[in-house]
Amino acid sequence: MLSLFSSSPIKLRYAFQFSNSVPHSALRLCFPSTSSLHSHSQPQSLDEAVDSFTRMLSMRPPPSIIQFTKILGSLAKANHFPTAISLFQQLQARGIAPNLFTLNILINCCCGMRRMTLAFSAFAKIFRMGFQPDAVTLTTILKGLCLCGNVEKALHFHATVLAYGFHFDQVTYGTLINGLCKIGHTSAAIQVLRKIPQHGIVPNVVMYNPIIDSLCKVTLVSDAFHLYSEMLAKEISPNVITYNTLIYGLCLAGQLKEAILLLNDMILINITPDVYTYNTLIDGLCKEGKIKDAKSVLAVMARRGVKPDVVTYNSLMDGYCLVNQVNKAKYVFNTMAQSRESLDVQSYNIMINGFCKIKMVDEALNLFEEMRRKYLVPNTVTYNTLIDGLSKSKRISCALDLLVEMHERGQPTNVVTYNSLLDGMFNIKRVDKALMLFKEMKESGIDPDIYTYNILIDGLCKSGRLIDAIEIFQDLSDKGYGPNVRTYNIIINGFCKEGLFEEALTLLSKMEGNGCLPNAVTFETVIRALFEKDENDMAEKLLREMVARGLLN
């Protein structure tokens, strides 16, 4: 644990230039507390806790600060943050002095709410009251700085604390490394890991796991395995979390065979895979369409007595839908329902998407109604999937009804919602309505993306409104959106259809200069149009260029 040398508290206090006077009214927010602060039982309800605290305040003499701190801690643990702070203020107003544990709760509150100035003020109060901060205090400050993204300040705090005689323990370093990894500063976390032995601390699995996790999430799997090998060399035993993370990384990188081998390794060294291990592997296999292999893993899971959960079945359903075996997905869905396995919103979203993909929109709508009957609240993904399916089926009125329903139920719309509707409207030639919807979209604060602009430009070109399409294309560039190859292909095709070959060729020549390489579709569009107009020489020239670029097989 933390050890402290003689005069360091006073020096550290002034080294950070803490404020000596922050009004209690400024400390109005609380935090999710750590288990180390709250080992006592929680009050049964908020009202009971407040009543108990109020009765204790009115006692003469009042109970020990320990009793008050227990209630504050239990409130914080139950996420009743403002209430806990309000009661703390009442405690102070009655002149009842907090102890170190009470102040640790206050610091954790400020850190959890990212109010670091107030956290440091509470930290200063520890010194003013003659206490010495413990490992919980300093760990909490470090965690708070990391939560706020203040990596440099966190590392500076760590260095300064060491310089003034404080020694951190394994828990503190685990917290610091985890905090750095959570905000994407994996390199800084690795640096801390490398320096830990200099301070007499032996690295452990809790320090390695967050770094391995961060590396796997950005598919730096080889780097993650380097750390895994380092753990083994240092006789630091990996745990189920280590293996789960590595299996996830391998699946994310498409290295499914290696992921299965690692699962076998786990079992051989008597580390029991949990439901998360199997779910990760099943999901990875299903996403690659390897349903047979996924079912084999499911069989192993059953043999080893690990019960599949809703996530397991959702992955299987999604896998079947990806390979257009929607009936098999529905069989899994029905089996879940019959076995009283809790179907969630994601389960319905998967099936609704599967039916919409194969144009069975009415079946999707039936599931949507079933969700309501079961008091499951559809989310934005549910609505977007149905709106897209209806729009592709040219049932725009129904799709627009769902848009209205989203607004009425307070369900957020996004750019995907509007892109589906715009595409559907252009497909049935409701051009003016589409442009009105585009205006409504922007007025509601939703920024269009490149797909939105491609839908608009394509729809206008196909409706014979090339001039309007060109205006939007130019507006796209003026607003800093980078047209992609699809955007250029749409406009070039529009020019060719109107016989504007010079404009089409000019735009083709400008593409590369604008950072967008033409593809086979670009050349084929122009070449086909030139041949149709007997511009054979120019068409053959472009054909040779296409071959030279390796775009013709």
Where do the model's predicted regions map?
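N-terminal targeting peptides
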Residues: 1-171, 180-191, 195-198, 202-206, ...
